[in-house]
Amino acid sequence: MQIADDEFRQLVERVDIDGHISVWGTYGVTTVRYLNRHAPILSNFRLGDVLPLLDSAAGRIFLTYLSERTTRPILKAEASKSEESKPSAKETAAITQFVRREGYAWIDGQLFHSIRAIAVPIFDSQGELQATISLVSNQASLVQFPNPVLDDLKATGKKISHRLGWSS
């Protein structure tokens, strides 16, 4: 985690955007580090918060790379708590295919109105997903692709993964 934390701090300073590191915990995608560059975008966002699988960029990374057996109970619990319609199986498959193909996930207002986020995976030496790093902003430019912030985030994710022994 120290390797990820050091690189993450440098990234957040370089791009001057809030960010967080998340891992898979007992209840799903759990935030273990959050750095604010400005006034907090999400004033009620706390360490230990559990993020949704479909409505957060970090969640979409975990949904893509963890087994269905692992994620299914969390998806069911999320669906039972929400009155909003969730993506169909086909739409969910399109999300995970995008993440695998492009190497990142993004959201634009799904979790909170006007909040945008992009996230990338962190893999270990065996190619297993260990964490995600995400950048969060209320600026629309964060999710206008391609953009240099996304390029930096992807490069940082790969650098952390390589330092953990992953080889692409």
Question: Where is each model-derived feature located?
Answer:
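Short loop/turn microsegments at loop-to-beta-strand junctions
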Residues: G19, V50, I95, A117-A119
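Amphipathic alpha-helical effector-binding/dimerization core
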Residues: M1-A77
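Juxtadomain coupling helices with adjacent low-complexity linkers
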Residues: K90-Q97, E102, H113-I115, Q130-S168
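Short loop/turn motifs at secondary-structure junctions and domain boundaries
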Residues: E13-R14, G109-I115
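Sensor-regulatory modules in signal-transduction proteins
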Residues: I122-S125
